[in-house]
Structure formats: structure tokens, C-alpha cells
């Protein structure tokens, strides 16, 4: 049986041809928690999730640690926080009544899964023609629905 210490080396060498983001090039044992380098900045999604309080505790703590060391990411978090506050303080968003009416007419689909009286056929999606009729309402006269009707109608 192979020495457990050499397995990580063999694993890293076997995958050394992959880009660094896919294969770890560190000397840390395989399966060890990843240590982020100071050059790895937070992604836009991570910044938004941090500002919105949507990160899990471990991710939040890692992001907070990075923010304490990285002025660039800290500035981006400040910008995101200001944008969030500006949106919350802006006027209420109003939806046009015509759009609200169209959205309220979307047929409700039964829950997925076979019903008691079904013979094994698929009962997913709206009844035939309902989705096509809905698509017709949003077509912009010049065929703007991009061929979806041909895929919906069977």
C-alpha cells in the first residue's frame, strides 16, 4: 500500500497540467482546507452576498479576513453597500398594470410527479396551447419569439 504522504504528491503531479484554479499546486495534504492567497480577490457575486448577509459563516469569516487585508476589495464592498442603500432609499418600484395582468394569467401547473389517475404519461407543464398562447402575447410582430413556438407545439 502506498505511503499516505506520497499520495498527495502523486495526485498533484497527475493533475499538474490543469490550470491552477482546477488543480491545487500547494504542498498541503489532499483534502486539507484551502488557504487563499492574498492575491485572490473576492468575486462580484461574493461581494454582493457579503453585503446582503447571504454568506455562510465560514465564507463570511474568510471574506471578512480578506477585506481586512485588501483595500481594493474593501472599496468594492463599500461601493456595493452604497448601491444597496441607494436602491433601498429610492422610490418604490411600480409594475405596469398590463404586465401584472399578463403575469396573473400564467396558468398554474400541477406539482411534478405522476398523479393518482395518470397512466404514466407526463403531466408536466401547462396544457397544450397555453404556453404557445402566452408566447404569442409577447411576440414583437417581427418573429421576436425566436422560434420558441415550434419547440412548444408538438
UniProtKB/Swiss-Prot annotation:
Positions of the region Disordered? 104-154
Low complexity bias spans: 124-136
Positions binding Zn(2+) in this chain are: 66, 70, 73
Indicate where this protein resides in the cell.
Cytoplasm
Q: Does the keyword RNA-binding apply?
A: no
Where this protein primarily resides, as one coarse class? cytoplasm
Q: Which cofactors are reported in the record for this sequence?
A: Zn(2+)
Tell me the impact of changing residue 70 to A: Considerably reduced interaction with SigE. Complete loss of interaction
The alphabetical list of record keywords is: Cytoplasm, Metal-binding, Phosphoprotein, Transcription, Transcription regulation, Zinc
Disulfide-bonded cysteine pairs: these are none
Q: Which residues carry this modification: Phosphothreonine?
A: 39
GO process annotations (BP): regulation of DNA-templated transcription
- Could you describe the post-translational modifications of this protein? Phosphorylated by PknB on Thr-39; can be dephosphorylated (at least in vitro) by PstP. Phosphorylation is the signal for subsequent degradation by the ClpC1-ClpP2 complex.
Result when mutating residue 98 to A: No change in phosphorylation
Q: What does the note under cofactor report?
A: Binds 1 Zn(2+) ion per subunit.
Query: Gene3D superfamilies, alphabetically?
Result: Anti-sigma factor, zinc-finger domain (1.10.10.1320)
Gene Ontology MF, one: metal ion binding
Q: Name one GO cellular component term.
A: cytoplasm
Task: Give the family from UniProt.
Answer: Belongs to the zinc-associated anti-sigma factor (ZAS) superfamily.
Q: How does it assemble?
A: Interacts with cognate ECF RNA polymerase sigma factor SigE under reducing conditions; this inhibits the interaction of SigE with the RNA polymerase catalytic core.
- Function, in words: An anti-sigma factor for extracytoplasmic function (ECF) sigma factor SigE. ECF sigma factors are held in an inactive form by an anti-sigma factor.
**Name of the protein this chain belongs to:** Anti-sigma-E factor RseA
Give the organism, scientific name.
Mycobacterium tuberculosis (strain ATCC 25618 / H37Rv)
Amino acid at each position: 500500500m502506498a505511503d499516505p504522504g506520497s499520495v498527495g504528491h502523486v495526485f498533484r503531479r497527475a493533475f499538474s497540467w490543469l490550470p491552477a484554479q482546477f488543480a491545487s499546486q500547494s504542498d498541503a495534504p489532499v483534502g486539507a482546507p484551502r488557504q487563499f492567497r492574498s492575491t485572490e480577490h473576492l468575486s462580484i457575486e461574493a461581494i454582493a452576498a457579503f453585503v446582503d448577509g447571504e454568506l455562510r459563516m465560514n465564507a463570511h469569516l474568510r471574506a471578512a479576513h480578506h477585506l481586512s487585508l485588501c483595500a481594493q476589495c474593501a472599496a468594492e464592498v463599500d461601493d456595493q453597500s452604497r448601491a444597496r442603500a441607494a436602491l433601498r432609499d429610492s422610490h418604490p418600484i411600480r409594475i405596469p398594470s398590463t404586465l401584472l395582468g399578463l403575469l396573473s394569467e400564467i396558468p398554474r401547473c400541477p406539482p411534478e410527479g405522476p398523479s393518482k389517475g395518470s397512466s404514466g404519461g407526463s403531466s408536466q407543464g401547462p396544457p397544450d396551447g397555453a404556453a404557445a398562447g402566452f408566447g404569442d402575447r409577447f411576440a414583437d410582430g417581427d418573429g421576436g419569439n425566436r422560434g420558441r413556438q415550434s419547440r412548444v407545439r408538438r
